[in-house]
Amino acid sequence: AFAGNPYLIDLDDLVKDGLLQETEIRSFNWGTDDADIDYATIYENRYKILRMAFSRFSAKSEDFLAFTEKSDRWLSDYSLYTALKRHFGDIEWQSWDVPLRDRDQEAVKEYQEILHNDIMFCKFCQYEFFKQWMQLKQYANSRGVQIIGDMPLYVASDSVDVWAHREMFLLEPDGRPNVVAGAAPDAFSESGQVWGSPVYDWNVMEEDGFAWWKARMLENMELFDVIRLDHFSGLVRYYTVSADAEDGRNGKWSKGPGRKLTDAMTEVLGDMRVIVE
């Protein structure tokens, strides 16, 4: 919900910063068909070349240190989670060793040391993404262009948000949801839909004044000029189905936080423009 996609890091900018050479970029296979994106190839080669750039980067730079301090609320968990995902072959976090799955502090500390370099690499990628994004936004705004950011209501089950904040979601002891978000049958789909995302425990979120949502909104306000809230109606009432359901026919409607959450978000939104969907 907070991190940027390293796929969007402009490698040419890394060349300008002296972290890469053009010949190094051309030495990788990025696909041969301009109309077809080979994401598997990009996944492997993108991270290989970003690691080359990281090997020449100084993690002691003032800008980098300022970014990591400012973003620490989410960056440390995200970087550890991403490093662990790669270390364990990209399997879902619910299948990790139980101590890590359950964020046992001794296990977390051990892997923070083991994967220190990988964790710093993840922080480097986020630093480069956000630096470039803010430069792009500034350029667009200076020419009268505003950016609309799409913010979905739910997050994926296999995500750092769920791993690091299990208490905020309706989950089984092993971290897997027994109910997931979906859509009831309607004119567009007679069988309904199963989205697969875990649903929030709104009662728990309310206890700290929806702090996670406020932080999420503040982060998005920096990135975009207008925020589009996808599935806004899910804040009023939401539809869930069994996690193993094949379709959305046999679901259940529940009451959402409604005005309690929107009032909390208004506290941080100020004059921010929002599109509701």
Task: List each model region and its residues.
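Alpha-amylase-like alpha-glycosidases and glucanotransferases acting on alpha-linked glucans and related
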Residues: 2-130, 155-277
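Conserved, well-ordered alpha-helix/loop/beta-strand core segments that scaffold catalytic motifs
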Residues: 122-155
